[in-house]
Amino acid sequence: MEEIQRYLQLERSHHQDFLYPLIFQEYIYAFAHDRGFSRSILSENPGYDNKFSLLIVKRLITRMYQQNHFLISSNDYDSNQNLFWARNKNFDFQIISEGFAFIVEIPFYLRLISCLEGKKIVKSQNLRSIHSIFPFLEDNFSHLNFVLDIGIPHPVHVEILVQILRYWVKDPSSLHLLRFLLNEYCNWTSLITPKKASSSFSKRNQRLFLFLYNSHVCEYESVFVFLRNQSSHLRSTSSGVLLERIYFYGKIESLVNVFGKVKDFQANLWLVKEPCMHYIRYQRKSLLASKGTSLFMNKWKCYLVTFWQWHFSLWFHPRRIYINQLSNYSLEFLGYLSNVRINPSVVRSQIVEKSFLINNAIKKFDTLVPIIPLIASLAKGKFCNVLGHPISKPVRADLSDSNIIDRFGRICRNLSHYHSGSSKKKNLYRIKYILRLSCARTLARKHKSTVRAFLKRLGSELLEEFLMSEEDVLYLTLPKASSALWGVYRSRIWYLDIISINDLANHKSKL
């Protein structure tokens, strides 16, 4: 952090609000590639990659601005030439975008540094850590009735991203360069290879587009910040990275124009005003839960669709928002199937000679392991077939038995660790069984034997560490408290380090 502040002169750039000259600084691209932290960036290094030099960057920008847009032709020779120019443009854009993504993050580095130095306290806007999502769902969802399952809309035009970023970065030259780069790349790839080029581009420039997408999501979440300030009872709990909006409150006069006058807005606010609204966002999905009725949630849905279409100038289909009743719907969120189950409870009461029954309905929040998506992921990784039957996984012949067992054991521990918050462990035990038997069959295949003959010849101690369940680990660690720990293990346990393996929530991890 000290080197970033030293070489980039962050305080000076912050006061001038002028980031464009930094694009021509060579050490920017060293920082963008995590270089230079172990040596002096300003010193000459003969082994340094010359493609990030000052002259190269200047030539790239000049060449992109002077590119002839009327080179598109139909014959084969010109098509090959166009493909050559397209590859050059992709290379140019990749180099500049890597440095630009680092530069536009400078205002946020400044804010973080000032916060660490105690100069300024960053407003949190009532944020929560991602670790609080599971306890929040467990504590609050059993008392709620309806939930809005919202898919966060994507901007349909690059100009929307540039306009949103304008409230964060006040340098017109940098924004103009970003607009030019995005438009030029989108137009060129649509003429050459739209699908393959855009896919490969998004993989190579994840940092820039992740920053632009987070800015878009922050603008989207500003709706709830605005409504919370209009109603002191509206509680907005965001579990995503919601940074502080800049100059947002200066746009209030424009926001209220949706309803006409300010008085009209205050008069219509009661339509979406409710003392117990909860908002959660994770990745590309968000939830808005309430105790209200179905009519109340429909009003919220209409309001959000109208606001997004007006404010973001994009068509937002109402079908991207689903209104679900928690008692009749299983919510797929963060790798779990969650619902609110009603447990009937009958109590017999007797007064003198008369007795009567009292029926109580107790709501309980359940979190289940989604067995079908997990089996599909295991089948994709060649651990089982599509029906969930374990199979042997082809491995390299040079891998030792301990390495194979360690790989299977690590996957099993990660899945067990992540889904330890499940209220029912049956599906989790099935996943463990698939991995354990697949490991045994893989080892037997390597030694050209059957599973039974392999275990009989080498002994079951080979898989003892891998087959050891978590309850056995608890018993060996604390034998005197085994009975109490058994009850703890069978209950829900939320681990605080699940963020490190949160790719399992998408069932897309490379097993």
From Swiss-Prot:
InterPro entries: Domain_X, Maturase_MatK, Maturase_MatK_N
One example GO MF annotation: RNA binding
Localization: Plastid, Chloroplast
Keyword terms, alphabetized: Chloroplast, mRNA processing, Plastid, RNA-binding, tRNA processing
Keyword RNA-binding tagged: yes
PANTHER family: MATURASE K
Name of the protein: Maturase K
Organism whose genome encodes this protein: Campsis radicans
Gene: matK
